[in-house]
Curated annotation (Swiss-Prot):
Keywords: Magnesium, Transferase. GO terms for molecular function: LPPG:FO 2-phospho-L-lactate transferase activity; magnesium ion binding. It comes from Mycobacterium sp. (strain KMS). 7,8-didemethyl-8-hydroxy-5-deazariboflavin binds at residue 63. One of its GO terms (biological process) is F420-0 metabolic process. It comes from the Bacteria. This is Phosphoenolpyruvate transferase. Pathway: Cofactor biosynthesis; coenzyme F420 biosynthesis. It catalyses: enolpyruvoyl-2-diphospho-5'-guanosine + 7,8-didemethyl-8-hydroxy-5-deazariboflavin = dehydro coenzyme F420-0 + GMP + H(+). Its cofactor is Mg(2+). Its EC number is 2.7.8.28. The keyword Oxidoreductase does not apply. NCBIfam families: F420_cofD. Homodimer.
Length: 331
């Protein structure tokens, strides 16, 4: 079976672990999952968080997925490298290098240095990511949504000048923690971007396409902003099943509620599902999974309530199983 997942953020990476657990891939590899009929997992990963910082290209969501699936993630933070040290950050601070609100760990810095060297040599991000994954063996194909620049920027009211200005998503997220007056999001460069090699084929050839319970605005929304992806979703023969990131009116991780409020969408499973919309209309969903005890009425979308707490890979695998079942696909 071929499974393609649109994903971003820490929660999305943990969702991929559940997919692997169900399919017997990666660190959960089983003998019965090997051979010519082995399952295949492809992740189309958000690049809207990507930025140049300290002279290196940082791709937070790609790295979080790679480290998580490769066993190198910091288990407490859910992002960054396991057993990290911070000597480079301390030295940069001693030199007074800006920005002082963003830090890179020493081990993580090595990843960014390799990536930046390859990008400057002319390799596209998709090939760079493939090369980095050779070290981590993530047990899945990780594809950036695009090789082109497509960055999420945020229009805020500057707390110091009281004037509107646009800042990179990383500054809004890390420096301000989304606690400044926020007016809109813009996916800078997305209109001129193209999908990375393999992305539309992964969607077209899939037996099922899953939307991870990632941030609907700045993770999944950023992916959908790239021309060609929404069209691929609408035309694939695979069923598209989404997972609500909202439980009891709140996201479990991140700031999806703040992002949703900016675009005028309520922090409910039903509102997010309606935001994605039914594929039978102008949207992208065939099915929508909400947390047990929750409900949603979305015309043209089959809704099912199941446990959506990703407490461990085995529990998350049951979430994935429910989505595959809703799609009518047999493992």
């Amino acid at each position: 079976m071929k499974v393609t997942v649109l994903v971003g953020g820490v929660g999305g990476a943990r969702f991929l672990l559940g997919v692997q657990h169900l399919l017997g891939l990666g660190q959960f590899a089983r003998d019965d999952a090997r051979g010519p009929d082995a399952h295949e997992l492809t992740a189309v990963v958000n690049v809207g968080d990507d930025t140049w910082m300290f002279g290196v290209r940082i791709c937070p969501d790609l790295d979080t997925c790679m480290y998580t699936l490769g066993g190198g993630i910091d288990p407490d933070r859910g992002w960054g490298h396991r057993d990290e040290t911070w000597h480079a950050k301390e030295e940069l601070a001693a030199y007074g290098v800006q920005p002082d609100w963003f830090g890179l760990g020493d081990r993580d810095l090595a990843t960014h240095l390799v990536r930046s060297q390859m990008l400057r040599a002319g390799y596209p991000l998709s090939q760079v990511t493939e090369a980095l994954c050779d070290r981590w063996n993530p047990g899945a194909r990780l594809l950036p949504a695009s090789d082109d620049r497509s960055e999420t920027h945020v229009v805020i009211t500057d707390p110091d000048t009281d004037e509107r200005r646009a800042i990179h998503f990383q500054e809004w997220w890390v420096r301000y923690r989304a606690k400044v007056p926020t007016h809109s999001f813009a996916f800078v460069g997305a209109d001129k971007a193209t999908t990375a090699p393999g992305v539309t084929d992964a969607i077209a050839d899939a037996d099922v396409v899953l939307l991870a319970p990632s941030n609907p605005v700045v993770s999944i929304g950023s992916i959908l902003a790239i021309p060609g992806i929404r069209g691929a979703l609408r035309s694939t023969s695979a069923k598209i099943i989404g997972y609500s990131p909202i439980i009891a009116g709140k996201p479990l991780r991140g700031m999806a509620d703040e992002c949703l409020s900016v675009i005028g969408v309520a922090s409910t499973s039903e509102a997010v599902g309606r935001h994605y919309g039914a594929r039978s209309g102008t949207g992208i969903l065939d099915g929508w999974l909400v947390h047990e005890g929750d409900s949603a009425q979305i015309d043209g979308v089959q809704v099912e309530a199941v446990p959506l707490l990703m407490t461990d890979p085995a529990t998350t695998a049951e979430m994935v199983r429910a989505g595959v079942r809703l799609a009518g696909v047999t493992l």
